[in-house]
């Protein structure tokens, strides 16, 4: 391990820079720097040499040319193990630069600002920074590259422990991270530029939703024992910029390692439960809700959700959108086996009770509003990309197409079952009353079959459908679904409409004295 004697620090994100530079100075490292970083360090009393003084060439072109100089890149790229390189560097007065600390202009923050112009974006495309990062990363055997200020403490500790040197393993890992950093940065620029509208040269072009070249960066969270099935290999990756409140922000408090299917089901449960404003419980099995309820507290919500389908709830994922107490966890553990229990927070008593089931995975996930910008689905040789289905409706958005108007209670129940239907695999039919699902029919090729399944689920659970409401995620292609619903004593239906036979469906509702509201919005889920 060679000792670091000279470092170059040039940062846009300067968090922790002063402390890190102070640690380097204590180890006798000479520090080169530029612009705002140099001023920050000098003001903090850290001895620093301006790059312009080091190279003998001033910054120019409004700061566009600062580090693009042979004394900088030669010092970074030169191989210390090649006599030819060493001789050339000595001939031209180029000294070694052993450590490079660089992060890049804030391009993402710039283009996120309202009114960002093309000129604004272009001026925040870093040139010298990526050049130094790539140079240092390429020459990792001799140069360490730090692009993430969060790494400063660990690097400082290793330098102190090794008398100013870093291991080959550390330098190589930093190199890999650096190349990922520049790849993500260039991908972000490409996404922005290729999503601009045709009036790109107008100064303030419109940004389209889908770039012509689509680049995404992901960070591996874990390798998994296997994938959806034991013969499949798998890993879990986190979006480099995840949406607020997304599952990837989970903190696992206890239990076995999450499996591929655990994560897929937990995501379905979390997206569903956080869509409710009132305290809610969602129980998911094979990515489908099998019981959902809203109530005044988590215990009541769980009891109602569980009552929908006690058989399917076995081995399920249970999610809440409120802090969970000990009484709720005790009720769950007394009732059933579960794979995952998740909520924004758990009381100390709740965790103590859950600890008795040591294999149960307990997750805390921040409850924040937010959705991924895109949903992605791989197909053979391609990728389907769409915006997320985050549409929410209220009573004012609905149109009543039946002779009978819904009652106040029916209005509330219609909105509830409609929200649940959005998270059920198509074809989806949901029956419910009083903030509780009574029957869920999911994933059938025929809508009337999903309707019959929902009715059978309610019957098996001993739940009386008289006066309940029904939701369909898409229109009824024929009146048969409405007829089956009417046979159950259900008195109100919500669905998108849009079928060629809509009038036939509306007439069927009137024949049965059913109140029918249409949304104009479909919620297919595949």
From Swiss-Prot:
Gene Ontology terms, MF aspect: IMP cyclohydrolase activity; phosphoribosylaminoimidazolecarboxamide formyltransferase activity
Signal sequence coordinates: none
EC identifiers of the protein: 2.1.2.3, 3.5.4.10
Pathway entry: Purine metabolism; IMP biosynthesis via de novo pathway; 5-formamido-1-(5-phospho-D-ribosyl)imidazole-4-carboxamide from 5-amino-1-(5-phospho-D-ribosyl)imidazole-4-carboxamide (10-formyl THF route): step 1/1; Purine metabolism; IMP biosynthesis via de novo pathway; IMP from 5-formamido-1-(5-phospho-D-ribosyl)imidazole-4-carboxamide: step 1/1
SUPFAM superfamilies referenced in this protein's UniProt entry, alphabetically: Cytidine deaminase-like (SSF53927), Methylglyoxal synthase-like (SSF52335)
Keyword terms, alphabetized: Hydrolase, Multifunctional enzyme, Purine biosynthesis, Transferase
CC per GO annotation: cytosol
Catalyses which reaction(s): (6R)-10-formyltetrahydrofolate + 5-amino-1-(5-phospho-beta-D-ribosyl)imidazole-4-carboxamide = 5-formamido-1-(5-phospho-D-ribosyl)imidazole-4-carboxamide + (6S)-5,6,7,8-tetrahydrofolate; IMP + H2O = 5-formamido-1-(5-phospho-D-ribosyl)imidazole-4-carboxamide
MGS-like domain location: 1-147
Xref: Pfam families: AICARFT_IMPCHas, MGS
GO biological process annotation, one example: 'de novo' IMP biosynthetic process
Assigned protein family: Belongs to the PurH family.
Domain topic, free-text comment: The IMP cyclohydrolase activity resides in the N-terminal region.
NCBIfam families xref list: PRK00881.1, purH
Alphabetical list of PANTHER family matching this protein: BIFUNCTIONAL PURINE BIOSYNTHESIS PROTEIN ATIC (PTHR11692:SF0), BIFUNCTIONAL PURINE BIOSYNTHESIS PROTEIN PURH (PTHR11692)
Name of the molecule in the record: Bifunctional purine biosynthesis protein PurH
